[in-house]
Amino acid sequence: RQARDGSFEVQVHGWDWIEGHLSEHADLAVRYGLIAVASPDFHDATTASTIAKQIGSRLATAVELMNDRRSVNERFTLQSISKHLGFPDWRKLEAIIEGRPDVSASELVNVARALGINEQWLLEGKQTPFLVDPEDYRGAAEQFDSIQRLNPRRIVFVRQSEDDFESIVAAEIDHFRWVTFHWDHPTSSHVGGTGKYQLLEYCCLIRRLYRTFDHPGACTLQGKHLERADFMRLWAGDVYPGTFLHWGHNDHWWIDFAELATGRVEGTSDSARELREAIRIARVVLANHQGPSERDGWMRTQLVHAGMPVNEPKSAAHYPLDLGLSRDRIDVDG
């Protein structure tokens, strides 16, 4: 607004937005006396703004988290990340981290997406550092569609090794980027009426992902157990998924679960006992949906996609993941 002496008073609302656009309108900043944050040579200024410094600091934190538990030879460097981002060299990325350059919001969003960083966290410091798919799917079939669109090179079925024994899916898209899916699946006896169906739906999801992706040159499927604290950090996006999932033993719990192979689950731990019980419940639900073709069409469709037989005279000992692809199912003994 204009004062009586002819000067102007500028009241700024939404400073983040103003600061982000000053570099595009430096002439206006000078004209209206905003010399404190802009000067005639604004585009060449090396002094970082507060917001740019904060964004740069968060990006540096994200890279540090990405390198947690990685060996020297496996570390993500500014050079390797810059090459992945398509930058001509490492200098631009270094400048972003130092908060020096005039970088547009769209460029920062592209950096976040390419590295699997949460955009809101990078730009505003909200939520958690790493990308978690927030969708609340109506069923496992919808989650399959989302995973398929990402075309991952590795899929990991992560199960909590204690308490509720929940499971989530994490997908490695490329050497840098992971996506953790927030939608959790039951893998224990801690289920009600709906949860019983969700057990079989998760079984079908795993089978369908295997039958779609797991072949030479495509995608690798693996399993992992995590203690509750680490599981919750992964689920929330507080930790880079590769920290827990980059290396390590491939836990075959997911194969036993997907093949409904109760007899293969060994051990006396709570985790093993609950997995056996989850498989038993899922087998009961499966038996209730194997029958005349006019019955429960929505579930039959999922069973067909998962390679499950829908007209069974008796239950099988287990249902191989590649049933109908390369080998026949193994019938129950006796």
Task: Tell where the protein language model's regions lie, with residue ranges.
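Recognition helix of helix-turn-helix/homeodomain-like DNA-binding domains
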Residues: H84-V103, N110-A112
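A short, Lys/Arg-rich alpha-helix, primarily the initiator
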Residues: Y32, V37-S80
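A generic structured-segment signal
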Residues: N118, P129-F130
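Conserved catalytic/binding loops enriched for acidic/polar residues
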Residues: K126
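Conserved hydrophobic/aromatic packing and binding residues within compact polymer-binding modules
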Residues: L59, L78-S82, K92-I96, L122
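Intrinsically disordered, low-complexity tails and linkers flanking structured cores
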Residues: A3-G14, I18-H21, H25-K53, L131-G334
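DNA major-groove recognition helix of helix-turn-helix/homeodomain DNA-binding modules
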Residues: A105-W121
